[in-house]
From Swiss-Prot:
GO cellular component annotations of the record: cytosol
Protein name (Swiss-Prot/TrEMBL): Probable GTP-binding protein EngB
Annotated Mg(2+) binding sites: 38, 60
Domain EngB-type G: 23-219
Cofactors demanded by this protein: Mg(2+)
Function (record text): Necessary for normal cell division and for the maintenance of normal septation.
A molecular function GO annotation: GTP binding
CDD domains: YihA_EngB
Gene it is expressed from: engB
Residues passing through the membrane, by range: none
Residues that coordinate or bind GTP: 31-38, 58-62, 92-95, 159-162, 193-200
UniProt similarity note: Belongs to the TRAFAC class TrmE-Era-EngA-EngB-Septin-like GTPase superfamily. EngB GTPase family.
Domain of life: Bacteria
Annotated InterPro entries: G_ENGB_dom (IPR030393), GTP-bd (IPR006073), GTP-bd_ribosome_bio_YsxC (IPR019987), P-loop_NTPase (IPR027417)
Amino acid sequence: MSLLWQARFFTTVNHLRDLPNTQVPEIAFAGRSNAGKSTAINILSNQKKLCFASKTPGRTQHINYFSIGGAHVGQHRKDETKVEEIRAMLVDLPGYGYAEVSGSAKHHWQALLGDYVQRREQLAALVLIVDSRRPFTDLDIQMLEWFAPTGKPIHCILTKSDKLNRNESTNALRTANTLLASYVDEYGQPFPFTAQLFSALKRTGIDEANDKILELLGLNDEVSEESDSKTAGDAEKAE
């Protein structure tokens, strides 16, 4: 069972001043509206309704936090989250790319999103959700360029890969890796950017994404320790 299955709603904020003062690592999910961000979060957390997608793309301009740890697994549990036991946060950022919002709302969203990804110290990495059929729009590039100067990792999940044939999938991943490799720091060293294919329908790429997210949150060692402990316990019972 993945640690991500422990995810449960923690809080929603509309201003930077309202961000939680927790000190655990955060990993943020960003992406164009309708790229499959909510679906990816729900599948990775093994919960159908953890993250809701707005019926009107581009309408949700809040930042939603989901805690890992501090409570029993599953949204149906009514027990209170123990903040001191939270180990990490999944952060759902507003989807971007639609014009159905007013100019003032769009400006507020851009300021909120830009300030969060550039200044939030607790932010360990960014997961960029990109439709594999329409990879890296201008707004996706803008997000990359907002975040790159932080030097923190970006993992790109190329969704809806089931809509592509094998050659198209290979080309989409190659294109993504080539683009990401073009981002280098002042010393010419590439930023820690990675990419993978993902399909909610075919349920492919889930384990790869899960392992990468836990690695970026620094929780993969805990998973290994728990696995080793379980293996040792099973061995003792067998004896």
